Structure formats: structure tokens, C-alpha cells
Amino acid sequence: MARNKGGLRFQPSGGARGPAIPVGKKQRLTIERLAHDGRGIAHEAGMTWFVSGGLPGEELEARVLGARSKVVDARSERLFSSSDLRRREPCTVAGRCGGCTLQHLEHGEQLALKQRTLQEQLQRFAGIEPEEWAAPLVGPEFGYRRRARIAVRWDARARRLDVGFRASASQEIVAFDECLVLVPPLQTIARALPALLQDFRKPESIGHVELFHGTASALLLRHTTALVDEDRQRLAAFCSAHQAQLWLQGAEQPLPVEPAAELGYSLGDWQLTLAYRPGDFVQVNAPVNESMIRQALDWLAPTADERVLDLFCGLGNFSLPLARRVARVVGVEGVAAMVERAGANALANGLGNAHFFQADLSKALAEAPWAEQGFTAVLLDPPRDGAFEAVREMSSLGARRVVYVSCNPATLARDAGEMARQGYRLKRAGILDMFPQTAHVEAMALFEAG
């Protein structure tokens, strides 16, 4: 379910303090290897340096962003020697924008880094390795994001509205001419958006903007004070010109300006359409999402007469394709609104064999009424915190096969260790390249009862 983008960031290491290093200081370094978050690692004068933009083997000059204990966070500013792994970034704000952190690294090496991260985390936290490594699931390198959040900030002193993406390791807003990772319809809207917002009569009322694309395009504007009619009309005309729905959000939940407006996305292989609202979790990469569902169902390999449990089911992204194949699917989710929408999606797609329940998945499952008859096949798609309490009960649920989809290799590895303690074997694992140009790792693992 809901993911927070991230990776290994600056963390104090504890122990004796190293020499004080002022922010802004420049240091010549040789990069030794990559951290899991894609930053280069170097050692100098007893300090470990994490350098954004550095690649193994490179000699560079880095500027200090922050330092504590024996760890320094820095950014590459000048190259003396370049790695063969380096490529020219196609984006004009790469290195400044906080969205794409790996554009300077060849895509094949991005995949290798993510594979290495998964392998090392499984070894570190669980001491295990899968019997088989699956090939990475990949999609387009660019033009894949169907959702984006654009930062907006009114500078009262300068009488200026800043519109763009958050910078890496700061609160700066980086303006952009185009964003290459967005799907083309959202690129068009994003390119025209700054000029629209900067013409607002009351730009200080804008909080941020989110863009969505699926069965329709949509623009959500979060406002901190009521919009004046003139600005509201500008927004409506802009959205009409770009064939996009307009949604507004004040202190309450997002609401469409046109009450009949609906957002959704299609899963063509299963002839499904799933409705959602701004704020609901939806995978941002449509091609990889479909490949992920296909692989999950292939690995789980449910028979037509099986009961399948889908934990952290959300809108029914896995539940409804499963319901096309098996006798009964039970989806469980912690957020009541998502449970309601999953049920509505099942009904809208004519699936009477998918049933959804709300439950706190950090607590015991075996006592729940929906769990009484047990399940031989289970699918989990938890948030970054993982599913430790749920996996502790896999054997009591009767699960013979478990597919675990993860957005955090560290918690997947921790939970894999618990699965191993219950007698499950890690049959297969692999990465899902849901976020090309970033170090974010999604993964899938198949466990079978021993």
C-alpha cells in the first residue's frame, strides 16, 4: 500500500565524533562504491562521505551539505575523472531536482544496484538467498509516471510564486521546463502550469498541485484559503483546454468541480477498470504495474477452486485480477475508504467472488471471522513498514504459497527471516523497476511451505 519514496539517507553513526566539517566546505575525493540509495561512498580523514552524483572510480570535488559524527553528506560539484558508468543526463535540472537521483547512471547499472541492494538486505537481515533469482521486471525508462506532486510556494518578500519540484536535501523549489519521467499528457499540463499559477490574483492561497492520469487526466489544487472567483475560473478554463478534470481540496477531502467526474485506471489483460480518488494509493508506473500483477499471479499459481487472501489490498489492484481466476478472494485493508472503494470496484466489474474487509494488519489475523476457513495461497503488498505481524501467522492460516510484494527491501528481508523460521523456503525473488532514474527498490518474493 501507501509508499513513501526514499532510500538510505544521512544517518548519524554514533561513536566518537570526527573533526568538525563546515557546511559548504569543498573536498577532493575518490568514490569507492555506491550506497543503496545511489550516492557514492568515499573515505577521507577518518570520515565516511556519502556523495550525491558520484560514481565508483571517479575523482571529484564535493561540497559538504551536512556532517555529524564520522559521516558527511555531500554533493558532487566538479569531476576530475569520469566513470565509464556515467551518462549525460537528459534532464536540464538533474542533480538539483530531488525526483530523479540516478539519471547520471546507465540504466543497466541502475538495475544492478537495485538487485545488489535486495541481495545484500536479504543476506544482512535474514541470512538467506532465494533458490532462484528472477529477471528484473522493467518498463520504459522515461514517460512512465502517471502521478506527480508539484510544489508551490509564495515568497511574500520577493512577491514571487515558486513552482517546481523539491530539491534534493533542501526545501528549495526547482523550476523546470519539462519532466521527462511524466506520461506525455501530464508533461503537457506540467509545462503550462507555472504560467497559469503565476497569473493568479491571490497566488498565496495555493498549497500544492497534484497531477493524475489514467482513464482521464486530472489536476488537484490544494488551497490554504478560499480561491477567489477569478482564480477559480482561470483554473477551470485551463483544465478544460487540457481536457483534464479539476479537483479542489481545502481543509476537507478532495472534491471534483464537476460532481460526476471519476478517475480510474485499466488493467487490460483482465478487462478491469479500477476507480480511485486523489489521495488513494495507485502505482505510478502503469506498464510495470501490469507486469507485476501478471508475475504475481504466475508465481502464486492459484487453481480455480482455491481461496486466496490478499493482505493490504488497497483498491483491489491484485484482488480483482485474482478474482478472474479463482473461486473466492478475500481482500483485507486497514483504511476504511479503500475497503469501500475496493468493494465498489468489484461490483462495477461484475465480480461477486471478491470480498473485502477492514482490519488492523498489525494485530493477530487468525481470530478474524474472514480467516476462519484458512487460505492456501496468500498475497501481501504492505507499506514500507512491512508485514511482520501478518507473516508471523502465515502457517496458522494454512498458506502453502505466499507472494510478497515489497517497497522496502530491508523490511522484506526482516519478514523473510520470520517466514524461514516458520518453515517456508524462499523459492524466488527479483526486483521491479517501478521507479526508473531513482534508487527506490520494489521487489517480489515467492515463499513455499517446506
From Swiss-Prot:
<dbReference type="InterPro" id="IPR010280">
    <property type="entry name" value="U5_MeTrfase_fam"/>
</dbReference>
<keyword id="KW-0479">Metal-binding</keyword>
<feature type="active site" description="Nucleophile">
    <location>
        <position position="407"/>
    </location>
</feature>
<feature type="binding site">
    <location>
        <position position="91"/>
    </location>
    <ligand>
        <name>[4Fe-4S] cluster</name>
    </ligand>
</feature>
<dbReference type="GO" id="GO:0070475">
    <property type="term" value="P:rRNA base methylation"/>
</dbReference>
<feature type="binding site">
    <location>
        <position position="283"/>
    </location>
    <ligand>
        <name>S-adenosyl-L-methionine</name>
    </ligand>
</feature>
<dbReference type="InterPro" id="IPR029063">
    <property type="entry name" value="SAM-dependent_MTases_sf"/>
</dbReference>
<feature type="region of interest" description="Disordered">
    <location>
        <begin position="1"/>
        <end position="22"/>
    </location>
</feature>
<feature type="binding site">
    <location>
        <position position="360"/>
    </location>
    <ligand>
        <name>S-adenosyl-L-methionine</name>
    </ligand>
</feature>
<dbReference type="Pfam" id="PF01938">
    <property type="entry name" value="TRAM"/>
</dbReference>
<keyword id="KW-0408">Iron</keyword>
<keyword id="KW-0949">S-adenosyl-L-methionine</keyword>
<feature type="binding site">
    <location>
        <position position="317"/>
    </location>
    <ligand>
        <name>S-adenosyl-L-methionine</name>
    </ligand>
</feature>
<dbReference type="GO" id="GO:0003723">
    <property type="term" value="F:RNA binding"/>
</dbReference>
<comment type="similarity">
    <text>Belongs to the class I-like SAM-binding methyltransferase superfamily. RNA M5U methyltransferase family. RlmD subfamily.</text>
</comment>
<dbReference type="InterPro" id="IPR001566">
    <property type="entry name" value="23S_rRNA_MeTrfase_RlmD"/>
</dbReference>
<keyword id="KW-0808">Transferase</keyword>
<feature type="binding site">
    <location>
        <position position="333"/>
    </location>
    <ligand>
        <name>S-adenosyl-L-methionine</name>
    </ligand>
</feature>
<feature type="binding site">
    <location>
        <position position="312"/>
    </location>
    <ligand>
        <name>S-adenosyl-L-methionine</name>
    </ligand>
</feature>
<dbReference type="InterPro" id="IPR012340">
    <property type="entry name" value="NA-bd_OB-fold"/>
</dbReference>
<dbReference type="InterPro" id="IPR002792">
    <property type="entry name" value="TRAM_dom"/>
</dbReference>
<comment type="function">
    <text>Catalyzes the formation of 5-methyl-uridine at position 1939 (m5U1939) in 23S rRNA.</text>
</comment>
<feature type="domain" description="TRAM">
    <location>
        <begin position="20"/>
        <end position="78"/>
    </location>
</feature>
<keyword id="KW-0004">4Fe-4S</keyword>
<dbReference type="GO" id="GO:0070041">
    <property type="term" value="F:rRNA (uridine-C5-)-methyltransferase activity"/>
</dbReference>
<dbReference type="GO" id="GO:0051539">
    <property type="term" value="F:4 iron, 4 sulfur cluster binding"/>
</dbReference>
<dbReference type="InterPro" id="IPR030390">
    <property type="entry name" value="MeTrfase_TrmA_AS"/>
</dbReference>
<keyword id="KW-0411">Iron-sulfur</keyword>
<feature type="binding site">
    <location>
        <position position="97"/>
    </location>
    <ligand>
        <name>[4Fe-4S] cluster</name>
    </ligand>
</feature>
<dbReference type="GO" id="GO:0005506">
    <property type="term" value="F:iron ion binding"/>
</dbReference>
<feature type="binding site">
    <location>
        <position position="179"/>
    </location>
    <ligand>
        <name>[4Fe-4S] cluster</name>
    </ligand>
</feature>
<keyword id="KW-0489">Methyltransferase</keyword>
<feature type="binding site">
    <location>
        <position position="381"/>
    </location>
    <ligand>
        <name>S-adenosyl-L-methionine</name>
    </ligand>
</feature>
<protein>
    <recommendedName>
        <fullName>23S rRNA (uracil(1939)-C(5))-methyltransferase RlmD</fullName>
        <ecNumber>2.1.1.190</ecNumber>
    </recommendedName>
</protein>
<keyword id="KW-0698">rRNA processing</keyword>
<dbReference type="InterPro" id="IPR030391">
    <property type="entry name" value="MeTrfase_TrmA_CS"/>
</dbReference>
<feature type="binding site">
    <location>
        <position position="100"/>
    </location>
    <ligand>
        <name>[4Fe-4S] cluster</name>
    </ligand>
</feature>
<dbReference type="Pfam" id="PF05958">
    <property type="entry name" value="tRNA_U5-meth_tr"/>
</dbReference>
